[in-house]
């Protein structure tokens, strides 16, 4: 009970993150920023309020780091889109390199619907590596409890943008244009479908520009 009562906003300042590296399947190292137990508990407390808000604006076909969703759901959606005779024949595959490490702090502070003072403290707390303190000027740590939700909010909206720009067009209730543009995203990995290579070549710079402004 004492630990719970200690989770107060007044006078709270997070400790610097502990930087560790884990080996990925390709042999490269992934940096993780590990908050203290108290800081993780405080993030979990604020995440309880942020998650329901994030769900109301989330992309419909975003499946990573969301409750009641998993990789199987993403696979099923891909099958639904691509298994028909009239399905799109072209796919643009995207992987936002170093997404967590390069998310714009300015964008987060301007757009995340939560206490900005607390968010700024978490983003700017720095990290310790080899007993040396380093500043954090961008990104949100992969070891943070709230980080996956922050990343999802950052990337949400791309599906809506594409749907508004590439939608079915009708004349006398007959479809005259069907671009077959669909987005399926799992965390920072996604695919975009299209009816032709030329269509995806047009879409690619839009997707790059959208993510570049945020991450």
Please give the residue ranges for each predicted region.
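Conserved polymerase palm-domain catalytic core
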Residues: 6-10, 15-16, 20, 60-61, ...
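Conserved phosphate-binding loops in nucleotide/dinucleotide-binding enzymes
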Residues: 31-32
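Active-site beta-loop-alpha junctions of metal-dependent nucleic acid enzymes
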Residues: 67-73
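Conserved small/polar residues in nucleotide/adenosyl-binding loops
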Residues: 211-215
């Amino acid at each position: 009970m004492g630990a719970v009562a200690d989770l107060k906003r007044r006078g709270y300042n997070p400790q610097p993150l502990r930087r560790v590296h884990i080996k990925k399947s390709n042999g490269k190292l992934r940096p993780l920023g590990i908050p203290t137990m108290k800081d993780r508990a405080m993030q979990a407390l604020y995440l309880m309020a942020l998650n329901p808000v994030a769900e109301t604006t989330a992309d419909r076909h975003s499946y990573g780091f969301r409750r009641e969703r998993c990789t199987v759901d993403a696979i099923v959606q891909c099958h639904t889109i691509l298994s028909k005779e009239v399905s799109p024949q072209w796919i643009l595959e995207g992987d936002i390199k170093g997404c967590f490490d390069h998310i714009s702090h300015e964008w987060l502070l301007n757009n995340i619907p939560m206490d900005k003072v607390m968010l700024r403290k978490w983003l700017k707390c720095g990290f310790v590596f080899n007993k040396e303190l380093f500043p954090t000027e961008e990104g949100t740590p992969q070891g943070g409890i709230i980080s996956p939700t922050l990343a999802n909010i950052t990337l949400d909206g791309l599906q809506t943008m594409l749907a508004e720009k590439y939608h079915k067009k009708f004349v006398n209730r007959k479809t005259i244009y069907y671009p077959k543009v669909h987005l399926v995203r799992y965390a920072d990995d996604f695919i975009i479908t299209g009816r032709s290579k030329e269509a995806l070549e047009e879409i690619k710079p839009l997707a790059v520009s959208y993510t570049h402004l945020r991450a």
